[in-house]
């Protein structure tokens, strides 16, 4: 199966960008709550 590099990068960005937007606030709140705990 031939994988188009450009398509692979596009899918990777398409998945990574929303994931980062969700993970960054979660990690901040998680580290803040664990730090105060």
Swiss-Prot record:
Gene: psbM
Membrane topology field: Single-pass membrane protein
Cell location: Plastid, Chloroplast thylakoid membrane
Keywords of this entry: Chloroplast, Membrane, Photosynthesis, Photosystem II, Plastid, Reaction center, Thylakoid, Transmembrane, Transmembrane helix
Role this protein plays: One of the components of the core complex of photosystem II (PSII). PSII is a light-driven water:plastoquinone oxidoreductase that uses light energy to abstract electrons from H(2)O, generating O(2) and a proton gradient subsequently used for ATP formation. It consists of a core antenna complex that captures photons, and an electron transfer chain that converts photonic excitation into a charge separation. This subunit is found at the monomer-monomer interface.
Family note: Belongs to the PsbM family.
Pfam families attached to this UniProt entry: PsbM
One GO cellular component, as annotated: photosystem II
PANTHER family for the chain: PHOTOSYSTEM II REACTION CENTER PROTEIN M
Main location: plastid
Source organism (scientific name): Pinus thunbergii (Japanese black pine)
Description of how the protein assembles with itself and partners: PSII is composed of 1 copy each of membrane proteins PsbA, PsbB, PsbC, PsbD, PsbE, PsbF, PsbH, PsbI, PsbJ, PsbK, PsbL, PsbM, PsbT, PsbX, PsbY, PsbZ, Psb30/Ycf12, at least 3 peripheral proteins of the oxygen-evolving complex and a large number of cofactors. It forms dimeric complexes.
Source lineage: Eukaryota, Viridiplantae, Streptophyta, Embryophyta, Tracheophyta
Transmembrane segments: 7-27
UniProt-recorded name of the protein: Photosystem II reaction center protein M
HAMAP family linked: PSII_PsbM
One GO BP annotation of this record: photosynthesis, light reaction
Keyword Lipid biosynthesis among UniProt keywords: no
Highest rank taxon of the organism: Eukaryota
